[in-house]
């Protein structure tokens, strides 16, 4: 099980260093067009491959541009991670857009809309946070 802990530790370090590099290291203007958040990092068991999930605030066009910038910077990022983490061979880095936050916001919006509709029909008393007993 020590192998699993090592992979988790490396993933946490990659997340930390990548966050730092997104702020100070990557100079590509496309990357700085939207607010980029790292949501998750997955590292393969042999530490040779790394998938970084990012959430990007902005419209679809700016998200695509930021993703292009991140993919273009993946070689630089691989070199910096190898140097900073002092790994013999740095993992190949792939960025993937994480739409989980968008989906969550959409679901919350739908739930709020449903609650408003139920209040209008009188199914839920206005100002009540509790669901009616069935």
Curated annotation (Swiss-Prot):
Q: Which Gene3D superfamilies has this protein been placed in?
A: 3.30.300.20
How does this polypeptide assemble, per the annotation?
Answer: Monomer. Binds 30S ribosomal subunits, but not 50S ribosomal subunits or 70S ribosomes.
Q: What does this protein do?
A: One of several proteins that assist in the late maturation steps of the functional core of the 30S ribosomal subunit. Associates with free 30S ribosomal subunits (but not with 30S subunits that are part of 70S ribosomes or polysomes). Required for efficient processing of 16S rRNA. May interact with the 5'-terminal helix region of 16S rRNA.
Say if the entry is tagged with keyword Electron transport. Answer: no
Q: Which GO terms describe its biological process?
A: maturation of SSU-rRNA
From the Swiss-Prot or TrEMBL record, give the protein name.
Ribosome-binding factor A
What molecular functions are annotated in GO for this chain? Answer: ribosomal small subunit binding
Question: May I have one GO cellular component term?
Answer: cytosol
- Keyword annotations of the record: Cytoplasm, Ribosome biogenesis
Source organism, top-level taxon:
Bacteria
Q: Which organism is this entry from?
A: Parasynechococcus marenigrum (strain WH8102)
Record's SUPFAM superfamilies? Ribosome-binding factor A, RbfA (SSF89919)
Family under the similarity heading:
Belongs to the RbfA family.
Question: What does the organism's lineage look like at the top?
Answer: Bacteria, Bacillati, Cyanobacteriota, Cyanophyceae, Synechococcales
What PANTHER family would the database entry show?
A: RIBOSOME-BINDING FACTOR A, CHLOROPLASTIC-RELATED
